[in-house]
Amino acid sequence: MLAKRIIPCLDVRDGQVVKGVQFRNHEIIGDIVPLAKRYAEEGADELVFYDITASSDGRVVDKSWVSRVAEVIDIPFCVAGGIKSLDDAAKILSFGADKISINSPALADPTLITRLADRFGVQCIVVGIDTWYDGETGKYHVNQYTGDESRTRVTQWETLDWVQEVQKRGAGEIVLNMMNQDGVRNGYDLEQLKKVREVCHVPLIASGGAGTMEHFLEAFRDADVDGALAASVFHKQIINIGELKAYLATQGVEIRIC
């Protein structure tokens, strides 16, 4: 069995790490490189960086910090933000990123997933899915351009359908960003994760809602996700990654202990 992964997420805007609640009202957390270094030293398995306004601004991720991160950490990291072409992806990978993640650009042009996978291999192509639960309809819908609340829109895709579509097109991994849970720290949406897990045959990463060590355990044990991504609990030092991994190991979770 592959070890489960603990993945800190760093949302980047204007060269700094920020964090919002339900993708809104972002506050500045700190500088990118020192945070990345700290998480690597604490025992993170990999890092994910989202340039959250790149797609909505119509630009690609700011590449200047990518190479600086690569210089100070020795764990894999993934970069997302406005990657709309093979050239965009090639540049980011050449600066040291191990994976690239696409979200809104994939919704605008689903063939991008296949072209990236064919060029760089499925192992480094991640598709991020921003999913919102509609309490009135009881359905999960995919959202686009979520980095800018003035441009965020609900797409025609239901989440389970889009999960299956991106796999057909070559996604090597899926990060499910559960917007309702984002930043509120009351647990991952286990019901949604279980439904997605049934149709997801590539590595699945849970994102949105972690507030306690037990929340990570529930995602691994009850929804069988491959990785758990979190931001605010790590940024605010509510949970230490090393202590989290030690706890998970005592609960029988296969995890890499540093």
UniProtKB/Swiss-Prot annotation:
Gene Ontology molecular-function annotations: imidazoleglycerol-phosphate synthase activity; lyase activity
EC top class named in words: lyase
Superkingdom to which the source organism belongs: Bacteria
Key words of the record: Amino-acid biosynthesis, Cytoplasm, Histidine biosynthesis, Lyase
GO CC, one annotated term: cytoplasm
The UniProt record lists the keyword Cytoplasm: yes
SUPFAM superfamilies recorded: Ribulose-phoshate binding barrel
Catalytic function, reaction form: 5-[(5-phospho-1-deoxy-D-ribulos-1-ylimino)methylamino]-1-(5-phospho-beta-D-ribosyl)imidazole-4-carboxamide + L-glutamine = D-erythro-1-(imidazol-4-yl)glycerol 3-phosphate + 5-amino-1-(5-phospho-beta-D-ribosyl)imidazole-4-carboxamide + L-glutamate + H(+)
Alphabetical list of Gene3D superfamilies matching this protein: Aldolase class I (3.20.20.70)
Active site annotation, chain numbering: 11, 130
The EC number(s) this enzyme carries: 4.3.2.10
Cross-referenced InterPro entries: Aldolase_TIM, His_biosynth, HisF, IGPS_HisA/HisF, RibuloseP-bd_barrel
NCBIfam families, alphabetized: hisF (TIGR00735)
Subunit note: Heterodimer of HisH and HisF.
Family annotation (PANTHER family): IMIDAZOLE GLYCEROL PHOSPHATE SYNTHASE HISHF, IMIDAZOLE GLYCEROL PHOSPHATE SYNTHASE SUBUNIT HISF/H IGP SYNTHASE SUBUNIT HISF/H
Sequence similarity: Belongs to the HisA/HisF family.
Role played: IGPS catalyzes the conversion of PRFAR and glutamine to IGP, AICAR and glutamate. The HisF subunit catalyzes the cyclization activity that produces IGP and AICAR from PRFAR using the ammonia provided by the HisH subunit.
Protein name: Imidazole glycerol phosphate synthase subunit HisF
